[in-house]
A protein has these predicted regions:
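Alpha-helical oligomerization segments
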Residues: 169, 173-230
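Intrinsic-disorder-associated interaction segments
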Residues: 1-8, 12, 107, 153, ...
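Short Lys/Arg-enriched alpha/beta "domain-start" segment
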Residues: 1-79, 83
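Generic detector of well-ordered alpha-helical segments enriched in charged/polar residues
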Residues: 9, 13-16, 20, 115, ...
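Extended, non-transmembrane interaction/recognition domains
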Residues: 68-189, 196
Length: 230
């Protein structure tokens, strides 16, 4: 059994606890394929200022030999807050991919403060590398996006876990004090984020490579992962 997977599972549990402490858990009735996605576990939360927080883990089952965690937190469309995203992909011996961002949906004071905190938190991480992003990603992610192609067990992994917890805690604490303003409407920006994420060819090919049928993948991506606000 991989020690790395055990550490990452512990991180996922800690993050779930943070979400449950700050938000209200709910069942997502659009997630209709729970039995068709072996090894997948999806959790959902919401609050007055968070319309959907989603944490998903995928265990190495069947064709899939990797462990994955995906987090997206979408604020209310009436809040001056970025979208929070975190993805971790690991093989049994190393973390092979990390992406994390506070992605702007509104040019406002709260978003600027939150992005400044993000910048300060990630700027000195030695394993954080600037990556050339595809056009769909450049349109939605911030210039300070955290990205790594390899994080080694030990000190680097400890830093990653600590950073993930810090960025999640700060985001959730901020969400409870950011004012709700009906003159703000970030529907278009949030929908653009979801539409652009769906342009990621790796997203689709990686799910299909796990042996998930195309129709199940499409329903999940369009209605659970990145559904647009109608």
């Amino acid at each position: 059994e991989s020690e790395l997977f055990a550490e990452l599972r512990h991180l996922a549990d800690q993050l779930c606890s943070l979400f449950s402490k700050n938000l209200e858990k709910y069942d997502n009735d659009k997630h209709i394929h729970t039995d068709d996605l072996p090894g997948w576990k999806d959790h959902f939360w919401k609050s007055n200022n968070i319309r959907k927080a989603h944490l998903k883990t995928i265990e190495p089952v069947g064709k899939n030999k990797m462990w994955l965690m995906h987090i997206n937190v979408f604020p209310s469309i009436y809040c001056d807050m970025p979208i929070f995203g975190l993805d971790i992909v690991a093989t049994p011996n190393k973390v092979s991919g990390v992406f994390c961002d506070y992605s702007k949906t509104y040019n406002g004071f709260s978003t600027d403060l939150m992005q400044e905190y993000f910048r300060e938190t990630v700027k000195d991480l030695s394993w954080n590398r600037e990556r050339e992003l595809p056009p769909w990603a450049k349109e939605i992610f911030s210039v300070d996006m955290m990205a790594a192609g390899s994080v080694r067990p030990g000190e680097e992994l400890d830093q990653l876990c600590e950073t993930a917890l810090k960025l999640t805690s700060f985001y959730l604490e901020s969400s409870s004090i950011v004012p709700y303003k009906t003159k703000i409407d970030t529907t278009a920006a949030q929908n653009k984020y979801c539409e652009n994420q769906k342009m990621n060819k790796m997203l689709h090919s990686s799910i299909l490579a796990m042996g998930i049928p195309e129709d199940v993948k499409d329903q999940y991506v369009d209605n659970v992962l990145f559904e647009v606000i109608k």
